[in-house]
């Protein structure tokens, strides 16, 4: 890296394992400054519960960023709405969680931070607090006024992007339009080049239907929509292979010659990735005007404050964000 960068971290649901994981992140050195957007007492109390050392340094945006030293974090304070008991949700803290996301997002947009790494949130408690919330991806898309974003999950061996995200199965076929596919593939291709440093991305594209439609006998979306779009984009120079049946695509003879897979819907691509690398996966939002990565697991309320949470996914998310920062410099 040319100079030390700042990355901002949101721990997520305060009653879950997010604060535990952030405290665990602090137990090693990092080449970037870790700015945690969270409540002061929440972090110090959780560190005490875990028996881990933690010194919180005030965020000073006008000072040069410094690499993070062991046992320290830089704190950008946001106050809890209610006091927290590990493992017990408090509805009012749904507002607190959204405040941390908004502050972190705005900091990325105004250039304070080079990347954003998010911990797990509890969507139910945020909605119970009266805040419509589908997920991080949609929240950052709206707040950043991005034209379109794409969800991609990745392990060291596999990257899977989604054409659609949190839609009921009955709505997916109607959502797969030529315009959507053009946009999603363009974003995926662009970010693989600019954020992952892949000069000529090779993308495998799943069909929508079983056997990729079996020549139109099991659905016509491949013939009517997917194939024409892929043909157009191939003519522009993109390296696209598909549409391929999803039940046979995820094997070495295809994956060894690909940089990413585009699945048509959430449960088509992600079960394979999570089986292959659960606990090591990272959620990446493509198409944003900043770098955003996230853990690939939930809040695990039952583990909060017990010292049993696995920090592996958070470490992977942070390391990937650092690599993406380097690629974009």
Curated annotation (Swiss-Prot):
User: By which gene is this protein encoded?
Assistant: pdxA
The note filed under miscellaneous reads: The active site is located at the dimer interface.
Q: What is its EC number?
A: 1.1.1.262
Pfam families per the UniProt record, alphabetical: PdxA (PF04166)
Protein name, please? 4-hydroxythreonine-4-phosphate dehydrogenase
Q: Tell me the superkingdom of the source.
A: Bacteria
Q: Which family does it belong to?
A: Belongs to the PdxA family.
Which Gene Ontology BP terms does the record give? pyridoxal phosphate biosynthetic process; pyridoxine biosynthetic process
Question: Which class of enzymes does this protein belong to?
Answer: oxidoreductase
Keywords assigned by UniProt, alphabetized? Cobalt, Cytoplasm, Magnesium, Metal-binding, NAD, NADP, Oxidoreductase, Pyridoxine biosynthesis, Zinc
Protein's pathway: Cofactor biosynthesis; pyridoxine 5'-phosphate biosynthesis; pyridoxine 5'-phosphate from D-erythrose 4-phosphate: step 4/5
Gene Ontology annotations for the cellular component aspect, listed alphabetically: cytoplasm
This protein's record includes keyword NADP? yes
Which Gene3D superfamilies does the protein's record reference? Answer: Isopropylmalate Dehydrogenase (3.40.718.10)
Q: Where does substrate bind?
A: 136-137, 274, 283, 292
UniProt: a divalent metal cation binding residues: 166, 211, 266
Instruction: Please describe what this protein does.
Output: Catalyzes the NAD(P)-dependent oxidation of 4-(phosphooxy)-L-threonine (HTP) into 2-amino-3-oxo-4-(phosphooxy)butyric acid which spontaneously decarboxylates to form 3-amino-2-oxopropyl phosphate (AHAP).
């Amino acid at each position: 890296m040319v100079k030390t960068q700042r990355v901002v971290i949101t721990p997520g649901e305060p009653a879950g394992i997010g604060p535990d994981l952030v405290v665990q992140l602090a137990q090693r050195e990092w080449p970037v400054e870790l700015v945690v957007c969270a409540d002061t007492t929440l972090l110090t109390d959780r560190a005490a519960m875990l028996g881990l050392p933690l010194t919180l340094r005030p965020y000073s945006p006008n000072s040069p960023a410094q690499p993070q030293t062991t046992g320290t974090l830089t704190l950008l304070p946001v106050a809890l709405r209610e006091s927290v008991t590990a493992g017990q949700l408090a509805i009012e803290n749904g507002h607190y969680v959204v405040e941390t996301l908004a502050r972190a997002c705005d900091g990325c947009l105004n250039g304070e931070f080079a990347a954003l790494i998010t911990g797990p949130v509890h969507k139910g408690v945020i909605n119970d607090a009266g805040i419509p919330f589908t997920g991080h991806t949609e929240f950052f898309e709206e707040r950043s006024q991005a034209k379109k974003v794409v969800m991609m999950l990745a392990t060291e061996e596999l990257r899977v992007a989604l054409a659609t995200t949190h839609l009921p199965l009955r709505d997916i076929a109607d959502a797969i339009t030529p315009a959507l596919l053009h946009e999603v593939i363009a974003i995926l291709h662009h970010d693989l080049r600019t954020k992952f440093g892949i000069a000529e991305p090779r993308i495998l594209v799943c069909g929508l239907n079983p056997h990729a439609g079996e020549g139109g006998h099991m659905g016509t979306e491949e013939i009517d929509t997917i194939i024409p779009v892929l043909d157009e984009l191939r003519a522009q120079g993109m390296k696209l292979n598909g549409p391929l049946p999803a039940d046979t695509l995820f094997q070495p003879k295809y994956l060894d010659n690909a940089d990413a897979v585009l699945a048509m819907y959430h449960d088509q691509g992600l079960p394979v990735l999570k089986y292959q690398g659960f606990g090591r996966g990272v959620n990446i939002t493509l198409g944003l005007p900043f770098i955003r990565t996230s853990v690939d697991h939930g809040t695990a309320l039952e583990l909060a404050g017990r010292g049993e949470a696995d920090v592996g996914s958070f470490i992977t998310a942070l390391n990937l964000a650092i690599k993406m920062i380097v690629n974009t410099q």
